[in-house]
């Protein structure tokens, strides 16, 4: 078939159908969303849960959600900006922070449903493959599916750090080791030790040491916040170990106390009838006094 020119006549515009708003904005991949949202027909009203992971310039957002016609319902959420509470005040968007955020989400969700004592997850972090299995006589493991959005799912992406944190925290999420740091595509082998290094930010610590030796000015510029908070390369692993323990001990979100805002008024309040009459009387008296002065 040869080239056919699209004739944009009245019929073309009359029958033209625009794409979904979030597709037009380039925010949602509906091909992927359809498969993440539609539940098996034999499961009736059971929601299909998704673990949503989004990485912004200064934060990492992790949520557990399910779809309804009215919109997505968020069951639980955790953010990287909560990590300073657990002792991590720097590097809130690296792979190690993504792992901590995923772990916080999992522990918070299981605590909400009263399953935190049943499904402890993997307390000893090895970086190796781990899958949560349902325990007989207990409620089944909480199952959800990773929603990476429009993120390019390359090996070593931070999205998979959050996934690993959630799995180690006790959630059942189908996955393989092919996208974790430490997987070699040529030899088809996975090295859990490399993955463990990334979970404890040892790759960052190694770079800190290297930069300190080679160019101290560049080190001071790149790791200014680490220096400000007194974090050295040797302290990084212990920092994350303490954070993991702290998250497991108390994952509950604490609401900030509501601030009492004193309302400011930007326009004049309406005068009552008595005030209006008084105002008129004052103006009259003022006018009469001025007249008397003028006459005298």
Swiss-Prot record:
<dbReference type="GO" id="GO:0005730">
    <property type="term" value="C:nucleolus"/>
</dbReference>
<comment type="subunit">
    <text>Component of the large ribosomal subunit (LSU). Part of a LSU subcomplex, the 5S RNP which is composed of the 5S RNA, RPL5 and RPL11.</text>
</comment>
<comment type="function">
    <text>Component of the ribosome, a large ribonucleoprotein complex responsible for the synthesis of proteins in the cell. The small ribosomal subunit (SSU) binds messenger RNAs (mRNAs) and translates the encoded message by selecting cognate aminoacyl-transfer RNA (tRNA) molecules. The large subunit (LSU) contains the ribosomal catalytic site termed the peptidyl transferase center (PTC), which catalyzes the formation of peptide bonds, thereby polymerizing the amino acids delivered by tRNAs into a polypeptide chain.</text>
</comment>
<keyword id="KW-0539">Nucleus</keyword>
<keyword id="KW-0687">Ribonucleoprotein</keyword>
<keyword id="KW-0689">Ribosomal protein</keyword>
<dbReference type="GO" id="GO:0003735">
    <property type="term" value="F:structural constituent of ribosome"/>
</dbReference>
<dbReference type="InterPro" id="IPR005485">
    <property type="entry name" value="Rbsml_uL18_euk"/>
</dbReference>
<keyword id="KW-0694">RNA-binding</keyword>
<dbReference type="GO" id="GO:0006412">
    <property type="term" value="P:translation"/>
</dbReference>
<dbReference type="GO" id="GO:0008097">
    <property type="term" value="F:5S rRNA binding"/>
</dbReference>
<feature type="compositionally biased region" description="Basic residues">
    <location>
        <begin position="255"/>
        <end position="268"/>
    </location>
</feature>
<keyword id="KW-0963">Cytoplasm</keyword>
<keyword id="KW-0699">rRNA-binding</keyword>
<dbReference type="GO" id="GO:0022625">
    <property type="term" value="C:cytosolic large ribosomal subunit"/>
</dbReference>
<dbReference type="Pfam" id="PF14204">
    <property type="entry name" value="Ribosomal_L18_c"/>
</dbReference>
<feature type="region of interest" description="Disordered">
    <location>
        <begin position="251"/>
        <end position="296"/>
    </location>
</feature>
<dbReference type="GO" id="GO:0000027">
    <property type="term" value="P:ribosomal large subunit assembly"/>
</dbReference>
<comment type="similarity">
    <text>Belongs to the universal ribosomal protein uL18 family.</text>
</comment>
<dbReference type="InterPro" id="IPR025607">
    <property type="entry name" value="Ribosomal_uL18_C_euk"/>
</dbReference>
<protein>
    <recommendedName>
        <fullName>Large ribosomal subunit protein uL18A</fullName>
    </recommendedName>
</protein>
<feature type="compositionally biased region" description="Basic and acidic residues">
    <location>
        <begin position="271"/>
        <end position="281"/>
    </location>
</feature>
<dbReference type="Pfam" id="PF17144">
    <property type="entry name" value="Ribosomal_L5e"/>
</dbReference>
